[in-house]
C-alpha cells in the first residue's frame, strides 16, 4: 500500500470536441422538452429549475438513459452558472478521470453536475431540482472558503 497522496486536480478550459458533445446533449434535451411541453424552452437560467423538475416528474427518462440524464445535468449546470456568481464550466483531470465540471472561482471546489442527477436516478432516489440547486448555492456560500 502506498502512502502517496492522489494527484491534485488540474483545471482547463473544456476542449472544443467536448463542448460540441455537451451542445448536442443540450439540443437533444431541448427537443425532448419541446415535444413533451409545447412552448417550453430551456433558457440556461434559474427559470429552468421548474422545467427540469417537470422532466423529472414526467418519468419520461429511464434511470439507465445516461445521455439524457447527463443532458439534464448540463441544463442544471447552465442554470447554476447564471445563479451563482463565480461558477464556470471547466474540464477537470484528477484521480477519477477527465470530466466537465462546475468550478467555483479559482478554488478546488467543483461540482460533478453531469452525473449528479444520473446517480440519483440510478439509485431510485427522489430528485428535487430546486432543493438541489438551493443546497448547492448554500454550500458554496458557506463552505467555499474551505477550498483552496
Features from the language model and the residues they span:
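Short, well-ordered coil loops that connect the C-terminus of an alpha-helix to the N-terminus
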Residues: 39, 86-87, 131
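Short coil/turn segments at secondary-structure boundaries
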Residues: 44-47, 93, 132
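Short runs of predominantly hydrophobic/aromatic residues within well-ordered alpha helices
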Residues: 45-48, 68-77, 110, 114
